[in-house]
Amino acid sequence: MTPMSAPETLSSLVDTRRVLVTAGAGGVGKTTTAAALGVAAAKRGKRVLCLTIDPAKRLAESLGIGEMRSEAATVDNARFEAVGIPMKGSLTAMMLDTKRTFDELVIKYSSTKEKADKLLSNKLYKYVSTSLAGTQEYMAMEKLVAVKDDPRYDLVILDTPP
């Protein structure tokens, strides 16, 4: 945006972007904004993935769904249509599982299944994959890279922690 140009509209953001990130201090409405962007985009016909890396798990509450897991779960469009929101697209939600994402990387880059299994069962690996400082942030970036090109989604919305 140049200093003299008008800001983008919500419609243009969800129509032209592949990834949107909500970021900021705690309590500013990141999760609510991520949920609203997801609903707005799905209403316009987009296939949306809302990925949260916030351990508070508020995205599930904002979307009116049960417990979030590391597997993508599509929100039933009937939920929205029941409250007068016609959905042309779909809204899927997923919560980052740091350990699982780390394990997926090991499997992806190991030359054999045996080598992957050996590393995955190693006590030091098990500790590092869950306790190393910065692991959650690194795995969040890895997961974002993995899903941003996923043909199942037109838009990925990343909900970040405070």
What are these regions (language model features)?
Residues 2-21, 28, 33-162:
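Flexible phosphate-sensing "switch/lid" loops adjacent to ATP/NTP-binding sites
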